[in-house]
Every structure is written in C-alpha cells, then in structure tokens.
Amino acid sequence: MSTASLEELLSAAPGGAAMERIVAWMVAALAEAPAATLAVHLPRALAVLAGWEDRHREGWLEGFDAPTPHPLAPLLRRVSFDDGDPDYVLPFFASPNITHLTELDFFLSGEGDESKRRVLDGLCGSPHLGRLTSLSLVGAGLTDDDLARL
C-alpha cells in the first residue's frame, strides 16, 4: 500500500510533506486495504486530517480547490485559514469538493480591505457551504449587508 506505515506517518513532525504522505496513504487505503485495516487505522488518519489547519497547508489542500472530485472530499469537515489570501481561498470556495464542510474558520485581520471584500464576496457567493454549522470570521469587518448575504 505505502512505503511507510500509518504509524510512521502519524508520528512524523507536522508539516505539509507529512500531510501529503498521510493523504496519499488514505487514498491508497480507501482503494486497497481490507475493511479490518481501515477500521483500525483510518479513524486516526481522519482525525489528523480533520484537525489540520491552514498554517500547515504546504500542499495538503491541493486538489480540494479543483472543479473535479477529490477522493477525500467527503471526509473534509473543518478548515481553518490563518489568512484570507483571495488567490488561495476563492478557488476553494468555488469547488464542489467543500460541500461536506461543517466548520470554517477565518482570521482576516491582517488583510487589506480590498482583500477582505474579495474573500467575503467569494464566501457569500459559494453554493457549496450549505452544511456549515460553524463559521468564524474574526477580523472580517462584516457589514449588515454581509450578514444578510450569509
């Protein structure tokens, strides 16, 4: 299945490369592993994926922002962004791969007003966020119109 065991991957230092290996292991596991193996190891890998934050993003969200299906899209439930770089988040909001998100956290206070506006417009215009139960937009400077759109 993989050259490294899941135990080795989970004990690796956090970072994008480690997450890429975990995601690759999960994709292979979904395709190849017997159900007993998945029952033991996949929940731990999913917990790592569910709690991973954007500051470790060096590639782990790659593919989730595509218009084509990502094999792990149904498993992605929570995403936290440390910044609101429109070039990074707007394709993410437009992708159907985020339809399973239940929690979305943003920290936007370091961005300029124009960047915030673009991010908020993309968020408000996304047709894929209907399952959100928690939305945090710290520092977004929401207006009454923004709240009405959300």
Would you name each region that the model predicts?
Residues 1-64:
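Terminal targeting and flexible regions in eukaryotic proteins, enriched
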